[in-house]
Amino acid sequence: ELSRLPGINFNKNLQYLLNYPHACTEQITSQGFPLLFIFDFTRQTDEEKTRNSEKVDEIIRILSSRQLPDGGFMYWSGDHYASEWVSTYAGHFLTEARQKGFEVSEVVLSKWVQFQQKLARNWTPTNPYRNYYSLSMPQLQQAYRLYSLVRAENTESGAMNRLRELKDLSIQARWQLAAAYALTGKKDVANELIFNQS
């Protein structure tokens, strides 16, 4: 090994991930994300590839079943309202899954994009939508939403520019927004967000 960091026991951690017992939408999404990229970091047998791909397909089905008519995703099965953060996270996962070649419903993604666009366009720093996430990190939530839309090839430039103009933009939101700008090819704006913090 060339790294000074201790090795990661992928097999042990993957087994834990595959058998993770918790089932809110955020936890299910967290279970799925590493499975999308594990093929990039480890060699796997055909059996392991099949098992991991089947798990991703299962997660896609579960997440799709938790989408509400407005396009957002519920935090817990049976909820009747969308969680903004979880909607961004679940939709981001579904976008990445589709880009990795997994089958994701166009209807699910389209409804999610519309939900995200509506929230992105109507977002203000004093957003009246109140829950744990929006009270604790509204700027990061908006920056991540904008990033996820860029990943889904539905850039909201106006909303990105409005967020960028905030005087007290948090460091976390700056970095997330910088990533969104970088993906759109505006690396100069991304660098300005990161290095010119005033």
Regions found by a protein language model. Give the residues of each.
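Primarily extracytoplasmic ectodomains and periplasmic/lumenal surface modules that are beta-strand-rich
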Residues: I8, D188-V189
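Solenoid-repeat scaffolds in large eukaryotic assemblies
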Residues: S157-M160, V189-L193
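Solenoid-like repeat scaffolds
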Residues: Y133, N161-I171, F195-S198
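Extended, solvent-exposed functional surface patches
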Residues: E1-S136, Q142-Y147, R151, S157-N161, ...
